Amino acid sequence: MTNRRQFLKDVVAGLALAGAGPLLPRLAQGAEAPSMGPAGLPAGTLESSLLDALPGKKPLIKRTFRPPNYETPLEYFNQAFTPNDAFFVRYHHADIPEVDAQAWRLEVGGESVEKPFTLTLEALQKDFEAVELAALCLCSGNRRGLFEPHVAGVEWGLGAMGNARWKGVRLKDVLARAGLKKEALEVVLQGADRPLVATAPDFAKSLPVWRALDENTLLAYEMNGAPLPHWNGFPVRLVVPGWTGTYWMKHLTSVQVVAQPFKSFWMNPAYRIPKGKFAVVDRFLSQESDTSTPITEMVVSSLITNLKAGQQVRQGQRVEVRGIAWDGGYGIQTVEVSSDGGRSWAAAELGKDLGRFSWRQWSHAFAADRKGVRTVMAKATNRLGSSQAFELIFNPAGYHNNVVQRLDLQVV
């Protein structure tokens, strides 16, 4: 009898032979295509990045189809929260489950708990206090496609991120029911998605126990007031505010507490940065080596959301520059904008503070008083005094690209 995994392998093979036409996500018809990404992406990236709509999603920028990796077009970042149907999609494996909420179970256990147990979705929602917070989910490789020289990996542009209100229960409350032993070191997380090839490593990650016990680390079951979308982790996913999305395990099925560093391809060698390259406050000490460290918290960054490179504006026009800024949860202190290529800077007006893990909207206006090229830049600084980089900090996996953005406008 053919099992589901073999069936999916056969489907993939069939798609390769048949051109994948009928089973591809539908291509948006009759709509103006948004920008597929900034200039500078590797050759062939823009040509292959079609505007596709996965079931239940608006047309998003397709970076890969198998596994599905789709980024959010820029226009959806001109609001406080990213709509669920426009939220980016990130998977490492192509065997993505259709989870029955009634049949879903979460196994909580491991060598370093006193009382392992199993939770249903109903019990998770009824037995523990519900909390809600705003937090940015950002892929570790966002803007990887802008690295020079280019590096291997999904060639993300600007949109492998989204801001949402997440509702769920604190992971620490669930772990308290299990009872942690004193030797507990890491919490291992496993989701229901699987590789198509049996020899490929399952996507499993761990958190240091102190981060798992942080009051802001959630087992989320709602996103922007609705159940989690299928493509964003239904029915339950981990939310680790301030840390990059690699830890935000989707379709969560297992939480295991262990007394030793967890060994997994996705912990080492994947998702590592050279030691000492970036100023990191939240370190994952049990997973560090002499030369590298796991990527953890997001670095301070910003994005101009209402203008595009090469856009024309009229001489004498007052040009509004709008955008968003974020960091690893310390809070944005200032955003400065330059309209003359960095020779002078002015403070932008910050929008409503939605919480330290949310992005912060900002705006600034300048007069386009002379014809020619006007180079617009934006630079964010957080409450620790950390600012964006003016030059790329190269690392072989293409992480933490927070270089100050430069957009050339044409004043005509």
Predicted regions and their residues:
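N-terminal export signals
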Residues: 6-29
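Structured, non-membrane catalytic/scaffold regions adjacent to prosthetic-group chemistry
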Residues: 31-412
